[in-house]
């Protein structure tokens, strides 16, 4: 991004993309007004459809518009909106964005279990709230596109975070390297597990920057020349004790944490703002990262979760999810499959030096 005029134009584009798409109840009253709403939505999101496809997509959009409208009339602590997924069925959405084969694998033998310890076990007190964004340990929201690479984005958030904590430098790292090169256990756009990705980064001696190995949103051939220029290394990873939100709280108080959740519900698909308390199960199908926690004025506890569906989704790319519920697994299974990277020092590989373009 260049300075002055180009910077201003880029900022205007970002604001346009993240601007909320609103509609009035009257736009739902007739088929004609609904068509007008659909065309306005398509223009807002620059979605092109063939004539045949438009009719099919309009019917889906109409159903979703009614769902969003009816849900927002209810007394819930969160709201929905017609986002970029509004003409996708929930089944299509799940298959494309949350069907990434992140499964609860620790019940099976052979999974990467870290070093078998939990370094934060003896932590007695934690702050009332934590926001790693405000501490400068979180990069801007990214977009995985139509590729089931959420596991890579979840992994990278946690590694970027612990690297900033140890070095005081925030460096955007490469999800595409994981997609292309971490293929022994993980499956690129067809899904993967964060624990395997942490192990890959450790074994390879680090991971390169996003600038050196940019994201493409498809499975490519591993570029060995780029892979052999690691910028940030880790010393391993640990798993948070399963089904224990108190243990998860201790971990998040000290660094961003990778988690898996069930993100396939309609309310999650169209989440806009507020503390999400919606219906969801524990069929873990999406990798995200917790970058903080807090409590609302009315006393509702929440996790601050960074997603990888772009800044237009949710609260500028984030979702606040209810924390401390009665189910031990946590809302949407958030406490079932949490892990974080270990970095013992500020030392990093010398294969490539971070540039001003890399550091944020």
Curated annotation (Swiss-Prot):
The keyword Lyase does not apply. It is found in: Cytoplasmic vesicle. Its EC number is 3.4.22.-. GO terms for biological process: proteolysis. The active site is at 150, 286, 307. GO terms for molecular function: cysteine-type peptidase activity. Disulfide bonds join 147-189, 181-222, 280-332. Low pH triggers activation of the protease and removal of the propeptide and the KDEL motif. PROSITE patterns: ER_TARGET, THIOL_PROTEASE_ASN, THIOL_PROTEASE_CYS, THIOL_PROTEASE_HIS. Residues 341-360 are annotated as: Disordered. It comes from the Eukaryota. Involved in programmed cell death. Shows a pronounced preference for hydrophobic residues in the P2 position and no obvious preference in the P1 position of the cleavage site. Accepts proline at the P1 and P1' positions. Belongs to the peptidase C1 family. This is Vignain. It comes from Ricinus communis.
């Amino acid at each position: 991004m260049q300075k002055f005029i180009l910077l201003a134009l880029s900022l205007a584009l970002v604001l346009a993309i993240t601007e909320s798409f609103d509609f009035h109840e009257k736009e739902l009253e007739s088929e004609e007004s609904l068509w007008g709403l659909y065309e306005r939505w398509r223009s807002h999101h620059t979605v092109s459809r063939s004539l045949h496809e438009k009719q099919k997509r309009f019917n889906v959009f109409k159903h979703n518009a009614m769902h969003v409208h009816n849900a927002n009339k209810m007394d819930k602590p969160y709201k929905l909106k017609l986002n970029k997924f509004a003409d996708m069925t929930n089944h299509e959405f799940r298959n494309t964005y949350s069907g990434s084969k992140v499964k609860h694998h620790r019940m099976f033998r052979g999974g990467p279990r870290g070093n078998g310890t939990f370094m934060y076990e003896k932590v007695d007190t934690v702050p009332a709230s934590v926001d790693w964004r405000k501490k400068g340990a979180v990069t801007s929201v990214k977009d995985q596109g139509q590729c089931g690479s959420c596991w890579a984005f979840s992994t990278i958030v946690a590694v970027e975070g612990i690297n900033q904590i140890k070095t005081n430098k925030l460096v955007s790292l490469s999800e595409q390297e994981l997609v292309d090169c971490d293929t022994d256990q993980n499956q690129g756009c067809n899904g993967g597990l964060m624990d395997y990705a942490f192990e890959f980064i450790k074994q390879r001696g680090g991971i390169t920057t996003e600038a050196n190995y940019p994201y493409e949103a498809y499975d490519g051939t591993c570029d060995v020349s780029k892979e052999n220029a690691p910028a940030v290394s880790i010393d391993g990873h640990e798993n948070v004790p399963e089904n224990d939100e108190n243990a998860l709280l201790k971990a998040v108080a000290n660094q961003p944490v990778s988690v898996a959740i069930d993100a396939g519900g309609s309310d999650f698909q169209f989440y806009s703002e507020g503390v999400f308390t919606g219906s969801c199960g524990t069929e873990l199908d999406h990798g995200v990262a917790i970058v903080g926690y807090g409590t609302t004025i009315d006393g509702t506890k929440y996790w601050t979760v960074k997603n990888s569906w772009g800044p237009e989704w949710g609260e500028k790319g984030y979702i606040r999810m209810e924390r401390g519920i009665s189910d031990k697994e946590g809302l949407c299974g958030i406490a079932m499959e949490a892990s974080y990277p270990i970095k013992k020092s500020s030392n990093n590989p010398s294969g490539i030096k971070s540039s001003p373009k890399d550091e944020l």
